[in-house]
């Protein structure tokens, strides 16, 4: 199959999740942008990564499957650690199915979470911006996002509180006896997670919240957005809060013994102690929620099976459109070349009407031969192709076809 067409068997997923390597080790499998750029030169195809707090996945579209073994070896070398041995490798339809499950919130630490849809969109946009991916992976990711939305509309998989951060806030509410408005809360980190926690706490009625961050200006920006306070990073001060949310990277382990509850969403975990809840603990809460959504999970799996078949049909349409475009471009190239040649000849015989007619006749004959000779040669060797051409001939047997029908045929 030509490289411009999509072959579902060329999709590959290299998967590490909280299930396969554990949350505490997951960060070791995150691939940096610089590493991806080096890897791109080693494979003929496209690359995109999806890295969240509960997964590190690399998606490939490769034109040469033999290169994949070398790719894994180079991945280990460039990463500086043998991570390929921990990978779950999925190919073709299995890779597509997995991404559809991820997009639908089925393969998540928090079943039914919405956040993954935004993460998928940002992942493919980033890989395109870095020059790592193009149409093939974009086609897959866009379809996955579409499937994810459809599953949520047709099932109750996302009913109730979903998302790992929502679970964290719910746990904090439980510990505070649903009186979170009067609790002294610290959020350590003013990045994406810190922002989300601040918004959720604001919506739950929290009032006494302070944002701590290494860069004070960033903490102040988040605090001002939600009407909270801001402080530079200071664990001595943080230790005096009732509930603490932590979402930063820190190269040392610390203890915060005074708070009633510390929810550490950092990867890897940085806070130690009996008062600490981690992503791993939240996973057990998520598992209990999953038990209440068994019917939705089953329905979602059935829908995904249908959507995979729909995806295959979308690939057929994609390839048909590419084939038509390729065919029409070739015809246009021939047409332009013949017009230019005929025009040059006509200029030589501007006053000879019979000769001009002869030139036009030769031009059209030449065009027909160049367009259809390769096709007819294939027909002679292929009975199925001959039957196909015969069907086309029957459709056009009256000698013409309306413009509207032509457009309709092109769309199909």
Curated annotation (Swiss-Prot):
Can you state the subunit structure given in the record? Homodimer.
Q: Which UniProt keywords apply?
A: NADP, Oxidoreductase, Porphyrin biosynthesis
The protein's job, in short, is:
Catalyzes the NADPH-dependent reduction of glutamyl-tRNA(Glu) to glutamate 1-semialdehyde (GSA).
Q: Which reaction does it catalyse?
A: (S)-4-amino-5-oxopentanoate + tRNA(Glu) + NADP(+) = L-glutamyl-tRNA(Glu) + NADPH + H(+)
Q: What is its EC number?
A: 1.2.1.70
The protein here is known as Glutamyl-tRNA reductase
Site note Important for activity applies to 98
**Could you say which residues bind NADP(+) here?**
189-194
Q: What is known of its domains?
A: Possesses an unusual extended V-shaped dimeric structure with each monomer consisting of three distinct domains arranged along a curved 'spinal' alpha-helix. The N-terminal catalytic domain specifically recognizes the glutamate moiety of the substrate. The second domain is the NADPH-binding domain, and the third C-terminal domain is responsible for dimerization.
Name the residues annotated as catalytic in the UniProt entry.
53
**Other noteworthy facts:** During catalysis, the active site Cys acts as a nucleophile attacking the alpha-carbonyl group of tRNA-bound glutamate with the formation of a thioester intermediate between enzyme and glutamate, and the concomitant release of tRNA(Glu). The thioester intermediate is finally reduced by direct hydride transfer from NADPH, to form the product GSA.
NADP is among the record's keywords? yes
- Sites binding substrate sit at 52-55, 108, 113-115, 119
Where does this protein come from, organism-wise? Sulfurisphaera tokodaii (strain DSM 16993 / JCM 10545 / NBRC 100140 / 7)
Pathway annotation from the record: Porphyrin-containing compound metabolism; protoporphyrin-IX biosynthesis; 5-aminolevulinate from L-glutamyl-tRNA(Glu): step 1/2
Q: InterPro entries annotated for this entry?
A: 4pyrrol_synth_GluRdtase, 4pyrrol_synth_GluRdtase_dimer, 4pyrrol_synth_GluRdtase_N, GluRdtase_CS, GluRdtase_dimer_dom_sf, GluRdtase_N_sf, NAD(P)-bd_dom_sf, Shikm_DH/Glu-tRNA_Rdtase
According to the UniProt record, what class of enzyme is this?
Answer: oxidoreductase
Database matches in Pfam families: GlutR_dimer (PF00745), GlutR_N (PF05201), Shikimate_DH (PF01488)
Q: Give any single GO term for biological process.
A: protoporphyrinogen IX biosynthetic process from glutamate
Listed GO MF terms: glutamyl-tRNA reductase activity; NADP binding
Instruction: Tell me its family.
Output: Belongs to the glutamyl-tRNA reductase family.
Has keyword Cell cycle? no
């Amino acid at each position: 199959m030509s490289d411009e067409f999509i072959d579902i068997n060329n999709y590959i997923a290299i998967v590490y999740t909280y299930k396969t390597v554990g949350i505490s080790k997951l960060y070791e499998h995150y691939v940096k942008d610089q590493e991806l750029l080096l890897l791109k030169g080693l494979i003929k195809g496209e690359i995109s990564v999806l890295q969240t707090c509960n997964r590190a996945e690399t998606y490939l579209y490769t034109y040469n499957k033999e290169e994949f073994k070398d790719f894994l070896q180079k991945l280990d070398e460039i990463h500086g650690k043998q991570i390929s041995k921990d990978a779950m490798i999925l190919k073709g339809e299995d890779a597509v199915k997995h991404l559809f499950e991820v997009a639908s919130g089925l393969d998540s630490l928090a079943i039914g979470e919405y956040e993954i849809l935004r993460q998928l969109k940002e992942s493919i946009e980033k890989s395109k911006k870095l020059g790592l991916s193009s149409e093939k992976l974009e086609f897959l990711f866009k379809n996955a996002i579409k499937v994810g939305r459809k599953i949520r509309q047709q099932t109750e998989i996302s009913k109730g509180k979903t998302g790992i951060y929502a679970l964290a806030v719910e746990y904090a509410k439980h510990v505070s006896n649903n009186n979170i408005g009067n609790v002294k809360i610290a959020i350590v980190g003013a990045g994406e997670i810190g922002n989300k926690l601040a918004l959720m706490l604001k919506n739950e009625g929290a009032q006494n919240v302070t944002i701590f961050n290494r860069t004070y200006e960033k903490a102040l920006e988040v605090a001002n957005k939600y009407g909270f306070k801001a402080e530079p990073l200071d664990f001595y001060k943080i230790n005096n809060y009732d509930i603490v949310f932590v979402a930063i990277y820190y190269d040392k382990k610390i203890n915060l013994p005074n708070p009633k509850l510390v929810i550490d969403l950092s990867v890897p975990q940085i806070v130690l102690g009996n008062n600490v809840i981690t992503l791993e603990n939240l996973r057990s809460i998520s598992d209990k929620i999953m038990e209440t959504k068994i019917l939705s999970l089953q329905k979602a799996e059935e829908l995904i099976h249908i959507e995979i078949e729909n995806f295959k049909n979308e690939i057929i349409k994609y390839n048909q459109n590419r084939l038509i475009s390729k065919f029409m471009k070739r015809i246009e190239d021939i047409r332009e070349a013949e017009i230019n040649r005929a025009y040059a000849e006509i200029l030589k015989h501007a006053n000879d009407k019979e000769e001009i007619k002869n030139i036009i006749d030769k031009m059209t004959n030449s065009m027909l031969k160049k367009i259809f000779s390769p096709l007819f040669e294939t027909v002679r060797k292929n009975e199925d192709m001959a039957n196909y051409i015969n069907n086309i001939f029957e459709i056009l047997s009256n000698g013409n076809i309306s413009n509207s029908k032509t457009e309709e045929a092109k769309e199909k």
